[in-house]
Amino acid sequence: ETTESYDIGVDLGFFNNRLGLLIDYYNKLTFDRLYDEPLWSSTGFSSIKSNYGSVRNSGVEIELNATPIQTKDFSWDLGLTFAYNKGVVVDLPDNGEEKHRVGGNFVYDPATGGTKKVGGIAEGERFGGRWAFHYLGTYQTEEEAAKAPNDPNAQGRKKHAGDAIFEDVNNDGQLDSKDMIFMGYVRPDKVGGIINTLKYKGLTVRIVMDWAMGHVIDNGFKGQIMGSSRNNNNAIKEAMTNSWQSANDGSKYPKYTVQSDYDYQYRNHMRWDNQIGSSASGSTNNSLYFSKGDYLAFREVSLSYMLPLSWIRKMRLSAVEVFAGAYNIGYIKKYDGMFPEIYTGVDYGIYPRPRQYNMGVKINF
């Protein structure tokens, strides 16, 4: 790989440096990225590792440092960071496809009434787009289910009351890739952080938070539990108590079956990817299990106190600091899973960052 990059930045200070502002714009172009280049089937191989294509990452990073309050005994220091990144494919080898797209499939285009190809990688597009079948609820009666569109995903299995309703977007009586809708991207494009430090005489309080916006997560962990009888001993209570049991019971999820939803072709929870969803094991490709990954994380709340010199001089000590803190405290989030910091698109039940506590005494002789 070869990379060309340039940065333009400005570093400003105001009010005797009680307010500082750093702004940096970057633009990085990477040539000859390493990809799996598809091969013709006549070669006997599906792909080969190859250096081809160009990717541009550009964005802005902003850092603001301020001391809003500063008196003889009290001060408040505030640090804010913000970063925005846009990554797009600039160039791919000519393969006869529009935008030289590699991979992907066709979806319905309401603007034209026809179809358009999406997914994979293509010139002028971001990485990591995700599409899924649009879950509308459940069939409440056998009469409703009898009118369901044909579902090749379910290999011809007939629908019944309690099965999932997926939108037939193009109204052709068939559920296929053309009916998948765009859900979002797997990586956030906006991230930031907040650091507050408050000091009063020898007492210091530090509060650290960070956030991310712009990504979606497919809760494959919940989808697998709901869609596989082999996991019924680990079933999520919220999901189990909210599964369809009878007509118009207000449930959120399709019926839970002893038979595996996946193996027995119910396909109420786990759907095939059709080349534009995610082919990763555990992906649901079902909008029911997608949600925004936006979060605000509380990383640290710590407290420290420097004992006054008048207290410690008699002990022939130069400094004594007592401290305590809590770390990885929790999140404000929209995602219903445990851990929103997932940038691969699929949550396999990743264990979240462990919450930590510490306390101690630091002594200088």
Question: What is each of the regions a protein language model found here?
Answer:
Residues T2, V102-G103, P188-K190, W211, ...:
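Intrinsic disorder/low-complexity segments
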Residues G9, D176-D179, V191-I194:
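Short, hydrophobic/aromatic alpha-helical segments in well-folded domains
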Residues L34-P38, G59, F166-Q174, Y266-A280, ...:
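Active-site-adjacent bridging/hinge elements
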Residues S50, T67-G184, M226-G227, N234-Y264:
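Conserved small-residue
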Residues G173-K178, F182-V186, S281-G293:
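Amphipathic, heptad-repeat alpha-helical segments used for oligomerization and assembly
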Residues M183-G220:
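Glycine-rich, aromatic-lined ligand/substrate-binding cores of catalytic
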Residues G214-E321:
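Extracytoplasmic gating/loop element in the C-terminal half of outer-membrane beta-barrel translocons
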